[in-house]
Structure formats: C-alpha cells, structure tokens
C-alpha cells in the first residue's frame, strides 16, 4: 500500500498531442557534473496517457507514474497546471 504513494510525479511541457489519448511530455531537470560540480540541464520525454484528450500542445502538465498501459506508456496525466496561450 505504501508503494502507491511512492510513485514519481513530474511537471513538464506537452510537446506532442497528435496521438489519440496519448501526449508526449518533455521534463527538464538538472544533474551535477561528477568532476566539475557544475549543474547541467538535461531533459527526457515521457509518453503519457490522456484519457479525455484534454491536454494541448504547449500546456504545462503534472504526470504520475502508473502501471504499464502500453509498450511505451508508463505515466498518466494528473492535471493541467497551466494552459498554453495561442496568439
């Protein structure tokens, strides 16, 4: 029961919403270089389940780790933190 609370939660930007019920989320974070100690920015893309197709390109979203939903989907959409502004 405690492992359900240990699931990873990330905040990232939607970079693709072309698939049905699936979005691609880019999560940026920092790592410290082992030798020099400088913080280096790196990013990773996660395929995420979006049941209602509610997230759009450019939105900032919160995603949570879940059971495998397909060959590549391991996360689900929790909430849309900030909607993108289309000019």
Curated annotation (Swiss-Prot):
Matches recorded under InterPro entries: NA-bd_OB-fold (IPR012340), Ribosomal_uS17 (IPR000266), Ribosomal_uS17_bact/chlr (IPR019984), Ribosomal_uS17_CS (IPR019979)
Protein name, as recorded: Small ribosomal subunit protein uS17
Keyword list, A-Z: Ribonucleoprotein, Ribosomal protein, RNA-binding, rRNA-binding
Family assignment from sequence similarity: Belongs to the universal ribosomal protein uS17 family.
One of the Pfam families matching this protein, by short name: Ribosomal_S17
Keyword Electron transport: no
One cellular component (GO) term of this entry: cytosolic small ribosomal subunit
Protein task: One of the primary rRNA binding proteins, it binds specifically to the 5'-end of 16S ribosomal RNA.
Species per Swiss-Prot/TrEMBL record: Staphylococcus haemolyticus (strain JCSC1435)
Gene Ontology MF terms in the entry: rRNA binding; structural constituent of ribosome
SUPFAM superfamilies reported in the protein's UniProt record: Nucleic acid-binding proteins (SSF50249)
GO terms classed as biological process: translation
Keyword Ribosomal protein: yes
Binding partners and assembly: Part of the 30S ribosomal subunit.
Domain of life of the native organism: Bacteria
